[in-house]
Amino acid sequence: MWRLLHCILGFIRLYLDGVKVLLYQLFNKSFRLPDLPEQNGKVAIVTGGTRGMGYEISRHLVSLDMHVIIAGNEEEEGLAAVKKIQEELNQGKVEFMYLDLASLTSVRQFVQRYNAKGLPLHVLVNNAGVMLVPERRTEDGFELHFGLNYLGHFLLTNLLLGALRKTGKPGKCSRIVIMSSATHYGGRLTLDDLQGRLCYSSHAAYAQSKLALLLLSYHLQEQLLVRGDPVTVNAVDPGMVDTALYDNLCSPAQVAKKPFAKLLFRTPAEGASTAIYAAAASELEGIGGLYLYNGRKTESSALSYDKRLQTKLWKQSCALVGLK
């Protein structure tokens, strides 16, 4: 009975958040990117950069003369994305590197391979994610939304902090961009059951993962500020975007989504615009700790600003991935 109620509440919260976003998108134009400065060979990693918003982020950063590493778990798709970008653009550099965020071993191997290249790291865009996946576990035993969307990015970010710190300089900070979502407003974080073992709902699991990413963003930014590190962290809400994230909707919801998607959803390029802005806009130099929606600073949920919760999640995450 409790499991059923939990599923229903998660479903209701997620779709209420969705309705609010659609109403906003109905009456407000999508954020239009301003002219952004040339990046002069700066290096960026974009997770999930093979398709959808990740591809659009990668393509646009390459167009600004960035060296972009597309990180993904589908090599054939990744190489195809690289080829397409190279054919479209005459500047910048793009390459693919294998990364499975659902595997902590793969995350560590990716960072080892990246560090072996001897490249600096100016921008890390944590974009990859899954949504509404039926109950599954990662190879490390974590619930998939929590393990891939959040925990994989948590480990990746921490392992790349050395490169980001080394690259950043006062007045020229390295940047971390974390893709959250409006679903975080309805998210709840159950620290004694982060894996949803007691009561699983794919809707609640997705919302929890997006709240966790926001808690990570705020806590990490504060840590970096205290240390005086030349690295900033900002979270981004892309809005409701017509991408493959919705492939796991049930059949009736898929049918209902189609007309709404054409009328109200953002395109992947539109959804990517705020993340691109966070990664490259000169007016955001040295500024972190923001939640950006449609190109503007926005208030996130009250729960996301809970410093005790941020700290508890950080400590628990370190224990789960084996960081001291």
Swiss-Prot record:
Catalytic activity line of the entry: a di-trans,poly-cis-polyprenol + NAD(+) = a di-trans,poly-cis-polyprenal + NADH + H(+); a di-trans,poly-cis-polyprenol + NADP(+) = a di-trans,poly-cis-polyprenal + NADPH + H(+); a di-trans,poly-cis-dolichol + NADP(+) = a di-trans,poly-cis-dolichal + NADPH + H(+); a di-trans,poly-cis-dolichol + NAD(+) = a di-trans,poly-cis-dolichal + NADH + H(+)
Disrupted gene: phenotype observed: Impaired fin pigmentation. Mutants have fin melanocyte pigment pattern defects and fewer xanthophores.
Chief place where the protein resides: other
Any single GO CC term annotated in Swiss-Prot or TrEMBL for this entry: lipid droplet
Record localization: Lipid droplet
EC number in record: 1.1.1.441
Active site residues of this protein: 206
Binding-site residues, NAD(+): 206, 210, 243
Any Gene Ontology biological process: dolichol biosynthetic process
Pathway(s) this gene product operates in, as recorded in its UniProt entry: Protein modification; protein glycosylation
GO molecular function terms noted in the UniProt entry: dolichal reductase [NAD(P)+] activity; polyprenol dehydrogenase activity
Key words of the record: Lipid droplet, NAD, NADP, Oxidoreductase
Enzyme class, spelled out: oxidoreductase
PANTHER family named in the record: DEHYDROGENASE_REDUCTASE SDR FAMILY MEMBER ON CHROMOSOME X, RETINOL DEHYDROGENASE
The family this protein is said to belong to: Belongs to the short-chain dehydrogenases/reductases (SDR) family.
Described purpose of this protein according to its UniProt entry: Oxidoreductase that plays a key role in early steps of protein N-linked glycosylation by mediating two non-consecutive steps in dolichol biosynthesis. Acts both as a NAD(+)-dependent dehydrogenase and as a NADPH-dependent reductase during the conversion of polyprenol into dolichol. First catalyzes the NAD(+)-dependent dehydrogenation of polyprenol into polyprenal; polyprenal is then reduced into dolichal by srd5a3. It then catalyzes the NADPH-dependent reduction of dolichal into dolichol.
Protein name: Polyprenol dehydrogenase
Species in which this protein is naturally found: Danio rerio (Zebrafish)
Lineage summary: Eukaryota, Metazoa, Chordata, Craniata, Vertebrata
Originating gene: dhrsx
